[in-house]
Amino acid sequence: MLKSSKKEDSSKKNQNNKLIFTVRKLFSPIKNFFRKTKTPDNFFGVIKRLKINSQKMTLDERNILANLLELEDKTIEDIMVPRSDIAAIKLTTNLEELSESIKLEVPHTRTLIYDGTLDNVVGFIHIKDLFKALATKQNGRLKKLIRKHIIAAPSMKLLDLLAKMRRERTHIAIVVDEYGGTDGLVTIEDLIEEIVGRIDDEHDQQLDSDNFKVINNSTIIANARVEVEVLEEIIGEKLHNDYDEFDTIGGLVLTRVSSVPAIGTRIDISENIEIEVTDATPRSLKQVKIRLKNGLNGQ
């Protein structure tokens, strides 16, 4: 599971090279400009002037420019992975258990480590450090492999977070609420995707840009992070009340059950709506299938 075929690696490498070339080409005029001036306030002025003179740019380059302009006002809260979707490992887990857990549950290169509860994240481990430890037959707990993360508030601007990640040389930020509890997670990949667009890997579900797909008049596949209000507009039926404490379809499901449901679990939301879990780990809900017994808008 953790190894890709040579063909997939080659295809992904070609995509990455193309992306790097596009970004370098786009940023070369910005780089040349800042060689002449050190004023930070000029950055978005340069971007806006580039947009005005963008006739010779490709569609990808114009999209990146548009994303950069939007980035000026975006905060961590706009893009963070919510607490309910965070996959993490207990500090007391040994290396062998961690290896199996990552294979089965956490298909990512970095995994959060917590002590006691998710409100006490102590850092993260990189999968290459784990493999090195296993290859050299190192025994013991995870403490020696843990790397430090950044603590950030939901209101922090994305550009400020990007600069902080660069200064502190770390790729993960834990978002904390006003009480110091874990509210969400942001990675360097999340920030890059805000600039260049979504970057799919072999673990991403093939949904559309809104993270849901209408299969037919009675079936919708949706990422668990899709907001309930978005689906309500499509379905034509109210799924939650103003006093409910969830915003996503995953949150809706979790209010109906006592724990994260297993893949294949079906839950009746209303007389017309049934939700089936199609992707989940023991710690988080990933994707669901929504069945409409009366069809979209009762059709």
UniProtKB/Swiss-Prot annotation:
PROSITE patterns: CBS (PS51371). Residues 80-142, 145-202 form the CBS domain. SMART domains: CorC_HlyC (SM01091). GO terms for cellular component: plasma membrane. The keyword Repeat applies. Keywords: CBS domain, Repeat. GO terms for molecular function: flavin adenine dinucleotide binding. It holds the Pfam family CBS. CDD domains: CBS_pair_CorC_HlyC_assoc (cd04590). Despite the presence of the tlyC gene, the true SFG rickettsiae are non-hemolytic. Belongs to the UPF0053 family. Hemolysin C subfamily. This is Hemolysin C homolog. The gene is tlyC.
